[in-house]
């Protein structure tokens, strides 16, 4: 068996395209190999701005053999009474590619039928790949693709070379006017010539000698080590930014860092502005001293090693100075206005075409934070902070700085609020209310920030659902899934035990006045939130059964629902959980068949056996203890108390016919089971486990 190498050489591919393209290409090729019955080993992908490559180990030389059974007509039609094949039998043999003597009689359950075992021919892997690779390569998805020349070919950037080797054998195919070959191109500036590959295995070493590190992980390690060495030489530390490392890593074929400088006068700008300007426009790494204070220098990573790197450093410094001069100008222009001035300008900024302006959204946020303040029993000081933070929360969207650097929204609002003398918590809330800005990101730390963040996300959710802008499949242009999870995470982390239902209904009321429509949209949103909470907790490691069982009872109190799920998930690990669950499921199922819980109280005078009396007495004793546990939020203890009822429930089912012909006895026994069901129904629906 040989290793398979496929490399697509191209003009500069955008950094963000590389990893998704490699993942897709790998999936498509392995699926094609599997579908063609070609066994193979591990896969590895490699990529730079100038190449996308895939290596598949231990690829079988040809398809695995496969036998299939072809069924024909019944035996009575395929053969005559003398056992000779009829015309139908002969035709079947011809169709199967066999002689009549090779026909097999098979009983398929409907009687004897003609059949034939066909062994499919095994094609060479080389031939199969040559046929499918052009299509697989052109099927790689990109955010944007392009045509070039007069060719009927699309790709992220023009394809300049194709390398395809199965061991030492070249796989021959063409895409457009580019034919596959056994060579690769080296570094586009330092070794642009062709390098012949003796085999697929020589790929990485050949490229290393040609100035290219194609292994993304290896190149990333070299990048991190080299920028650290450059920072150490400048007596500085790098401002950590792993995302920027990934971006820069896919901008170069080999990293060559250099330290550049800018004028100290720009250090008057907020750190976030300096870092963002260097990062977003130039992909530079900001540097700080040992105390964490930004220094007037940075690291730029080049794709080539120049003869005089000092000249390169000066060039980078000249470029960033122009960027920082613009930022400094915008900063000073913004400081001539107050955040309250900016609020008025929000009237001209559209939130969403169907949902009004950002000024109107600000008004809704003020209403929602006031409502939330009541739900969390906020004191007057917190209420005041919330109202002010809500009013100023979107003000920086019209600032010159955010127009230039959109990622600074909230951050620059916090900076301007601090400079304007706002309460520190109000200023911080302006930044925090966007959190989490990505899945797994930091949550707000201040109470004002937490409540404002919930209000903002709730308003967006209610507005989009009211305008029928509901996520479908992979499409979620307003990030409603992320915002929903943000609401749930903040409520859970902060221990906010107010009713999510009350919050959603208040949010929807700002968009809908019709009661029926309000109820319909609120129900949709709550189901959406329930789905997000289910996925969130399953991702955290809780069993889906435990999550569904607990949330089906209620999820409006998020911290309470989490405690119930946690307790139930722990109980599920106990060895005697299965019989316990079975007993309680039986209780639920009997009640369901009878049309639900009994509407009458238990009448002890109707008990006619010890099992009824024992269960009733135990249930009464347990109920009191369970209520105490639930009030304390100790659902683990509550479930343990409830589990003590299992022997009594089992005994009742063994000794008593619940669905007795005597109506009075039947109703009384249903009432007894209803009292048992009421205990665990406060925690979870055991029928879903």
Swiss-Prot record:
Protein name: Glycine--tRNA ligase beta subunit
Pfam family, one: DALR_1
Gene Ontology CC annotation, any one: cytosol
Domain of life: Bacteria
UniProt-listed GO biological process terms: arginyl-tRNA aminoacylation; glycyl-tRNA aminoacylation
Subunit structure: Tetramer of two alpha and two beta subunits.
Keywords: Aminoacyl-tRNA synthetase, ATP-binding, Cytoplasm, Ligase, Nucleotide-binding, Protein biosynthesis
Compartments reported by the entry: Cytoplasm
Known EC number: 6.1.1.14
SUPFAM superfamilies: HD-domain/PDEase-like (SSF109604)
Entry's family note: Belongs to the class-II aminoacyl-tRNA synthetase family.
Reaction catalyzed: tRNA(Gly) + glycine + ATP = glycyl-tRNA(Gly) + AMP + diphosphate
PROSITE patterns referenced in this protein's UniProt entry, alphabetically: AA_TRNA_LIGASE_II_GLYAB
Keyword Ligase: yes
GO molecular function annotations of the record: arginine-tRNA ligase activity; ATP binding; glycine-tRNA ligase activity
Gene name, Swiss-Prot/TrEMBL: glyS
